[in-house]
């Protein structure tokens, strides 16, 4: 299993659950977690996924031969939290590149370089389907990811290709959201309330649900919520 964005949050939880279930896991990103560097079935490839040149040079090919290979495009950033016109070119470019472009480029490599049975997943978001004030770049990037998954699923009906909505998860990104101002993000009070009431989903719950979906053989929607597949 290849997972991007494994240093914390959902990606780290997916890696831990996959290792527990016996998968070989290769993480891709800037910071290697000890979980992968110290585990016999773990490995890590250093690559800044917001760097187009580094991403273009990256190869997913491996000498190992697997019965099945799964790519989970999980790396992402909240991006600029402010009215759209106040976001800088650099902020917008970084958000779109990391959240959408890198996932598309990695998926293209995955589909062409990896042989055998394949499954492809993207960490999506409810923000792909609802306009949230202050999150213009994030909403747009996640909408792009959802549509890309839908198109690839049509182009490759023989493969399992999905984007999953994890819901509001207790991750560093949520802490970043709570640290914003009401001026930049009018909905911040709701996210603070969700955290203080203990309503956030644990990353481990999302990971368990996703691995359950990966192991299923029946058809499921291309875009799905992990909360519908809890174990």
Where are these regions (language model features)?
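Active-site helix of classical SDR
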Residues: 107, 141
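Residue(s) in the substrate-gating loop at a strand-loop-helix junction
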Residues: 125
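N-terminal Rossmann NAD(P)H-binding glycine-rich loop of SDR-like oxidoreductase domains
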Residues: 7, 15
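Conserved glycine-rich Rossmann-like NAD(P)H-binding loop of the short-chain dehydrogenase/reductase
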Residues: 21-35
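Conserved mid-core segment of classical short-chain dehydrogenase/reductases
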Residues: 78-93, 134
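Rossmann-fold cofactor-recognition segment
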Residues: 39-53
